[in-house]
Amino acid sequence: MKASEVIANLQRRFPNEPEYIQAVSQVLGTIEEEYNKHPEFEKANLIERLCIPDRIIQFRVSWVDDKGNVQTNMGYRVQHNNAIGPYKGGLRYHKSVNLGILKFLAFEQTFKNSLTTLPMGLSLIHI
């Protein structure tokens, strides 16, 4: 599958995650020409394996606010890629953070870690 096909496929699969799609599109746009020169990359499904997180854990967090009311929020843990080492974690606490943003942050941090030769993958948590 060519890089442009992967992007189109991701847009169909994750239409409500524009931050994630934008990050993947930008990275794939910069490597597409070189990627297309190597049919072995396509045979190994390299781009999809790199772009789609290894796992996403979704969970509920219930808590009591200052007025004594029970609130419920959703939490997410995105374990993006552990190809070069164990998952490295990070936390985000803000009402504006969503799964698409976490996938975007995890995707980009995976590249930062690999480019700086840090022997770790990436995982982010949002509550």
What are these regions (language model features)?
Residues 8, 12-30:
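Ordered core of a single globular domain
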Residues 11-17, 43-49, 65, 92, ...:
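Active-site-adjacent core segments of small-molecule enzymes
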Residues 21, 37-44, 117:
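Flexible, glycine/charged-enriched surface loops at secondary-structure junctions
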Residues 40-69:
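Structured beta-strand/loop patches that form or line metal/cofactor-binding pockets in enzymes
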Residues 69-110:
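N-terminal cap/recognition module
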Residues 126-127:
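Conserved small/polar residues in nucleotide/adenosyl-binding loops
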